[in-house]
C-alpha cells in the first residue's frame, strides 16, 4: 500500500505511543481527585500543558483540551456567537473551511446569525479588500483556516488580525489543524485557535482549543470543573502528555521534514505537468505537503477509486466532507465546476519515500491512460 493521504490522518510516532503507554501505566488516578494518585496525575497533565504552551507561545491557562479539532471549532464558534450576541449576529468566514467550521456556521445561521463568505483570489488566498467591505459594527467574528486542507494555501492571518483591530467587538477564530507541523504557528492577534494531534503524528481523540484568557466562552460540555472550567469531564492524562510529545517532535524537526517533502512535491509537479489533461490546482506557494490536481473529464472520485484498486491511497476533498459535490476550495480558485468535480488531493509526509513516489507515478500513468481513453 502507498499511503498519500497524510492530511486526513497521520500514523502515530512510535515515541508518542511509547509516551502514552508509559503515562497511562504510571498515572492511574483521576487528576480531579484530592489524593496522592490524583495529585500525580494532575502534575503530569500540568507538565504537559506547560510544555504545549511553551511550544505554541501561549499561556497554560489559555489551553483547553478537547476530543479533537471538530469539537474545538464548535466550541469556539458557538461560544463566540453566544458571548457577543448582544453586539451583533454577523459572522464572516471563507469557502475553504473544514466541515466542522462550515457546519457549525450553518447551525448558527439557522439560529438567526448572518453568515458571509469571503471571496478567494486565484492564488488561493482570501480577498482582504472584500473583508474590509463586509465588516460592519455588527460583525462579531471572523473564522478562517490557517492552511486549507485541499489546496495547502496559507492564509494571511496576521493581515486579517490587523484589519480587525478597528472592530473591537469582532473576534478572530483560526483553524490551525492542517498547519501544525508544516509551518510555524503563531497565536498573535488571534482570539481562539483549534488543532488536533492526529494531524502531526499524535493519537486520535485529543485536540486543543487555545483561547484568550479574557474570553468567557460558554462550555459545550457542562458538569463541573476539570483541567479548566470551560470543559467538564475526567482529563485523559496520557493523551495530553502524548500530544505534548508529538508537538515537541513536530516543532523540533520542522525544517528537516519540510525540506524532504518539498523535494518530493517538486518531483510530482514536474512529472504530472507533462500530462496535457492534468491541471495542478495547488499554487506554487502552497505548503509542499499538499498537491491538488484534476484530470480533465474524469471525476475525482473515479480516479481515486482506480488508484485505490492499485494500492494507492489519495483523497477527494476533506475526509469529513460530503461525497458527490465539487470541491469548494478548488471551485473558489478556478471558478470551474467540472474542474472542481475532477479534483483530488495527494498529501505527503516526511515518511513518504522516493520509491513510493515512483510507484505512485507508475500507477497514475496507467490510470490516466485507461480513464482518459474512455472520454
Predicted regions and their residues:
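Pyridoxal 5′-phosphate
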Residues: 1-375
Amino acid at each position: 500500500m502507498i499511503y498519500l493521504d497524510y492530511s486526513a490522518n497521520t500514523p502515530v510516532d512510535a515515541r508518542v505511543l511509547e509516551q502514552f503507554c508509559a503515562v497511562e501505566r504510571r498515572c492511574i488516578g483521576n487528576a480531579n481527585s484530592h489524593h496522592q494518585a490524583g495529585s500525580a496525575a494532575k502534575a503530569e497533565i500540568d507538565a504537559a500543558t506547560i510544555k504545549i504552551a511553551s511550544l505554541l507561545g501561549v499561556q497554560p491557562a489559555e489551553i483547553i483540551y478537547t476530543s479533537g479539532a471538530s469539537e474545538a471549532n464548535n466550541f469556539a464558534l458557538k461560544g463566540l456567537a453566544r458571548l457577543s450576541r448582544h453586539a451583533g449576529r454577523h459572522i464572516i468566514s471563507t469557502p475553504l473551511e473544514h466541515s466542522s467550521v462550515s457546519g457549525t456556521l450553518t447551525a448558527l445561521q439557522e439560529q438567526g446569525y448572518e453568515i458571509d463568505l469571503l471571496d478567494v483570489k486565484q492564488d488561493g488566498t482570501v480577498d482582504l479588500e472584500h473583508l474590509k467591505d463586509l465588516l460592519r459594527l455588527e460583525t462579531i467574528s471572523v473564522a478562517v483556516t490557517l492552511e486549507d486542507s485541499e489546496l495547502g494555501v496559507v492564509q494571511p492571518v496576521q493581515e486579517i488580525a490587523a484589519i480587525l483591530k478597528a472592530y473591537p467587538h469582532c473576534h478572530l477564530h483560526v483553524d490551525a489543524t492542517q498547519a501544525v507541523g508544516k509551518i510555524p504557528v503563531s497565536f498573535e492577534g488571534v482570539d481562539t485557535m483549534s488543532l488536533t494531534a492526529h494531524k502531526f503524528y499524535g493519537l486520535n481523540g485529543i485536540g486543543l482549543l487555545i483561547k484568550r484568557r479574557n474570553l468567557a466562552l460558554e462550555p459545550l460540555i457542562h458538569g463541573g470543573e476539570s483541567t479548566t472550567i470551560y470543559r467538564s469531564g475526567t482529563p485523559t492524562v496520557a493523551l495530553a502528555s502524548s500530544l505534548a510529545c508529538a508537538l515537541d517532535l513536530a516543532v523540533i524537526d520542522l525544517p528537516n521534514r519540510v525540506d524532504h517533502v518539498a523535494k518530493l512535491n517538486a518531483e510530482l509537479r514536474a512529472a504530472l505537468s507533462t500530462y496535457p489533461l492534468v491541471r495542478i490546482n495547488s499554487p506554487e506557494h502552497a505548503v509542499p505537503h499538499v498537491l491538488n490536481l484534476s484530470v480533465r473529464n474524469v471525476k475525482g472520485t473515479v480516479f481515486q477509486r482506480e488508484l485505490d484498486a492499485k494500492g494507492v491511497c489519495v483523497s477527494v476533498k476533506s475526509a469529513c466532507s460530503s461525497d458527490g459535490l465539487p470541491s469548494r476550495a478548488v471551485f473558489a480558485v478556478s471558478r470551474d465546476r467540472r474542474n472542481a468535480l475532477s479534483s483530488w488531493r495527494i498529501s505527503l509526509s516526511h515518511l513518504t519515500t522516493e520509491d513510493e513516489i515512483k510507484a505512485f507515478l507508475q500507477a497514475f500513468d496507467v490510470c490516466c491512460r485507461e480513464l482518459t481513453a474512455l472520454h
